[in-house]
Amino acid sequence: MQLRTRLSLEYCTVLLESCIQSKSLFQGKLIHQHLLKCLHRTQETNLTNFDVPFEKLVDFYIACNELKIARHVFDKRPHRPKNVVLWNLLIRAYAWNGPYEEAIDLYYKMLGYGITPNRFTFPFVLKACSALKEVSEGREIHFDIKKDFVLSNVYVSTALVDFYAKCGCLDDAKEVFDKMHKRDVVAWNSMISGFSLHEGSYDEVARLLVQMQYDVSPNSSTIVGVLPAVAQVNSLRHGKEIHGFCVRRGFVGDVVVGTGILDVYGKCQCIDYARRIFDMMGIVKNEVTWSAMVGAYVVCDFMREALELFCQLLMLKDDGIVLSAVTLATVIQVCANLTDLSMGSCLHCFAIKSGFVLDLMVGNTLLSMYAKCGIINGAMRFFNEMDLRDAVSFTAIISGYVQNGNSEEGLCMFLEMQLSGINPEKATLASVLPACAHLAALHYGSCSHCYAIVCGFTADTMICNALIDMYAKCGKIDTARKVFDRMHKRGIVSWNTMIIAYGIHGIGLEALLLFDNMQSEGLKPDDVTFICLISACSHSGLVADGKYWFNAMTQDFGIIPRMEHYACMVDLLSRAGLFKEVHSFIEKMPLEPDVRVWGALLSACRVYKNVELGEQVSKKIQKLGPESTGNFVLLSNMYSAVGRWDDAAQVRITQKEQGFEKSPGCSWIEISGVVHTFVGGGYRSHPQLAQISNKLDELLVEMKRLGYQTESSCVFQDVEEEEKERVLLYHSEKLAIAFGILSLSPDKPILVTKNLRVCGDCHTAIKFISLVTKRDITVRDASRFHHFNDGICNCGDFW
């Protein structure tokens, strides 16, 4: 019986070897079943005969990518195997396929059983460590390698170089590399590819490539390692150098090298070179090549060409080229950039049919596409249907809500993301901070800032720019400046953001000083800088400075003014009441004035009650086609201010006939991290209705005692004065301020945000409220910030 069992086991081992070659899972499982029966029936006390077939069984399951079953067989084997080869097989499988933690865990179990690793064990474990970026574990294994005297082995040393380089420990990688007695092409390639992964490493990579040629000849894998470093610097010269090197060495025929060079040309914005490489590759092109060419078109902003190429790729499916999720996601992103909902929807259907819709990357780009096309409800429906979501999924939906004007929902999704246990990324904060800025939600903005500090995101310029904007729009201009001053690196956007922040707060002199500082640091202003600067001069009444910099923009900096610059200049001159100069300026404009230019002039006509000019300007706007309700409101206000009620009513009728609905006045205030919203006349919806109403009545009595009179012209309806007074009393900003007085201690400033311009009566009333209550009150309206203190507003009563 024992002899028969032994023969049966030997036969099973031979059969399993055959199954490994043929990857026949079904046959292998039958042999596994037979081995278990033999093990159950055997009466032998020594089970060592079963070691070889069970080890071969583990090898078989690894070959068939059935890692879970392989591990189960390994753990349940009759004897603990002392064969280091078997341990290496399983460690290698985990190192290549994951979970990588299991490879490291097996390594330590192996040591615990007294099994000595060999020169093949260490490279596999180090590969798992590099995948996990487990530097401390890798250093311990390095110590074990030194202890076992295998550092002289080129295979082990190369693995150490690769591990340290991929983990960013470049000095350690260089130290190991320099100590190697012998370096083959694989060792050099590991060093080069490892350095290529890290920003700013091109010079070192180029130096290594030159040194390598004195030792061994580079191969195509060397070039594949060099190309990421070239792509990082986006240098066409370096790209051409590597391309020439490949031509001389005969590497251009390699599909991987050709695809890499194509990718470099795309990232260098040299689409013609990229397309030439693509066409020269002929039939050797694979799916990655096609995907790289599509990506190159996207990087160079040739979106339609990217779609056309994708359609060509779909027709090649019968030629064996298989579409990948990466390519599909790239093309869906193209539809998002073009806001091509029709094509995007077709690709969504294709993703469903092909099964790619289950891919997380494809799902995230579909979310982004629907959001950018304005179909936020469709994006949310798809988001709810997703089986798996990550930080990118939440970021896409948050960004969609914010971009489509629903910051409150975006903030709610941000909170849901955190409750789901998913940590926000840099891109998430870059989407959330504008929502906080729009809502003036300082509590959430400050919390996001703290999170950014903890995660090290404040080193990112984009995050700092968003923080400056958020703090400025939450009324904390000093905090915004602190963020600006502490930035490690300030780009032109950073300076522009800070200049416009000073502008909307009416601190034009600081904006001018900052502009001087920017030039002192050697940074050249762009066209947006001058829009910010002239706007800041306009809000602060700095007419001479605004005129000077408008002229200097062309004469000293060679920047041709755009329509936005002319609109800012018209606003600057109009605010100062210089109507003759405005008229002359508009006549001399090389561009035909648009609605923005005439709208700026109409706003001044309202303030100065220049009805005649206002009517002329309004006709110009009507001829061009008004873009929003704002200009209708300005004209209606102007008629109401001089008692021309019929004309004011006619403007509102025209507004409705042309399909422009006036947005209801809405104001909000943040108290203890909760944003409270008030709609004009809609105070009844608030739970503290009675207290708010009583506080407003109390304030009205005190204000009248100090000389306050309602500006009834701000009521468009021709009704009794008493009724006008009640209508004005319940404007949204007054409701929010009254709630702030009730909710905040007297030493706390009040910040209210409004979606429209503050009306004249509210502006006057808030000056009186600041005088009565002895409180600092800040109101951010659609135009600027109004800082009220002791009955005075910093806008000088012009907004």
Residue ranges: model-predicted function:
Residues 1-184, 190-799:
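Terminal (and in a subset, N-terminal) low-complexity or junction segments at the ends
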